[in-house]
Regions:
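Non-heme Fe(II)/2-oxoglutarate
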Residues: 2-119
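Short, flexible, solvent-exposed loop/turn segments with mixed acidic/basic and small polar residues
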Residues: 29, 143-145, 196
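Intrinsic-disorder/low-complexity, polar/charged segments enriched in Ser/Thr/Lys/Arg/Asp/Glu/Gln
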Residues: 34-37, 120, 151-153, 204
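Catalytic core of non-heme Fe(II) oxygenases with the double-stranded beta-helix
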Residues: 109-186
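Catalytic core of Fe(II)/2-oxoglutarate
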Residues: 160-227
């Protein structure tokens, strides 16, 4: 499916607008088992440098999550996004996660980003501290390429899973990951959410970009890479 780069909001709800664009079934009683696409694993010793920057990540909400990305005003309707939280009785300015894009002190994260050979590409350390919640939504990356099939979003889990940490894709709960595990999902269609009810921060690297032929070659087989 080819999506246009731009679209207009059809409602005052980001969630309802996203549902109208998606081909997901939205049947909560149908048990999803195939929403998470496992790509392989990075190995290496990044824990010390990760710990040195985890406190540097800036708390973000729906309104400021794109600051410094160059996509601040693209496919964004903060009012509709915040309306979903208000309707649910939540604080529309609540912290949804903490973001860090400066990898000067954690060069391994830059090597992970570069490994996938995407162009253009951006990445950020996406950390949730205890009590932080990113409510159900569907991503809006249509501005990156005229054909959404060329746009890839990859998650690298940076520390072992702790009970109370979860990512939800569709209605499939993703947990029990190990440090270095890599996955992706069908971002134009799959609703997802993340939360941390554990007693430790949950860091992951989110890499987003346009695939090249080299990227497709890398994804053609399971990843086993020391970084």
């Amino acid at each position: 499916i080819t999506h246009r780069k731009e679209y207009r909001y059809m409602s005052t709800s980001n969630w309802e607008d996203a549902k109208a664009r998606s081909n997901y079934h939205f049947n909560k009683w149908h048990k999803d088992t195939d929403c998470v696409e496992h790509l392989g694993k990075f190995t290496g010793g990044w824990q010390t440098e990760l710990q040195s920057v985890i406190e540097d990540a800036k708390p973000l909400n729906w309104g400021n999550r794109r600051e410094g990305t160059g996509r601040e005003n693209t496919n964004v309707n903060v009012e509709a996004e915040e309306n979903d939280l208000k309707t649910a009785g939540a604080d529309p300015k609540m912290t949804i996660y903490r973001g860090l894009k400066d990898f000067t002190k954690c060069p391994t994260l830059q090597r992970m980003t570069d490994y996938f050979e995407m162009s253009p590409v951006s990445s950020k350390l996406h950390t949730q501290f205890t009590g932080e919640v990113l409510n159900m939504h569907i991503d809006k990356l249509y501005d990156l390429d005229a054909d959404s099939d060329n746009v890839l979003r990859i998650m690298v889990m940076l520390q072992d899973w702790e009970p109370g940490q979860f990512l939800m894709y569709g209605n499939e709960q993703f947990d029990r990951w190990r440090a270095g595990d890599i996955h992706k999902f069908d971002w134009p269609n799959i609703p997802h959410a993340t939360a941390n009810a554990s007693n430790k921060p949950r860091p992951m690297l989110v890499i987003t970009g346009v695939m090249t032929d080299k990227t497709r070659g890398i994804l053609a087989k399971p990843i086993k890479k020391k970084v």
